[in-house]
Amino acid sequence: QIETNKKCQGGSCASVCRKVIGVAAGKCINGRCVCYP
């Protein structure tokens, strides 16, 4: 998993993870987006 510094209040991490790892797979943990390659 790849932790990002993107906050994810009231939103999904799909667009963030798509930019970071090329796959829209991730979830919000402790207010931050965590992506799963």
UniProtKB/Swiss-Prot annotation:
GO terms for molecular function: ion channel inhibitor activity; potassium channel regulator activity; toxin activity. The record marks 27 as: Basic residue of the functional dyad. Gene3D superfamilies: Knottin, scorpion toxin-like. The modification Pyrrolidone carboxylic acid is found at residue 1. Disulfide bonds join 8-28, 13-33, 17-35. The keyword RNA-binding does not apply. It holds the Pfam family Toxin_2. Keywords: Disulfide bond, Ion channel impairing toxin, Neurotoxin, Potassium channel impairing toxin, Pyrrolidone carboxylic acid, Secreted, Toxin, Voltage-gated potassium channel impairing toxin. It is found in: Secreted. This is Potassium channel toxin alpha-KTx 15.3. The lineage of its organism: Eukaryota, Metazoa, Ecdysozoa, Arthropoda, Chelicerata.
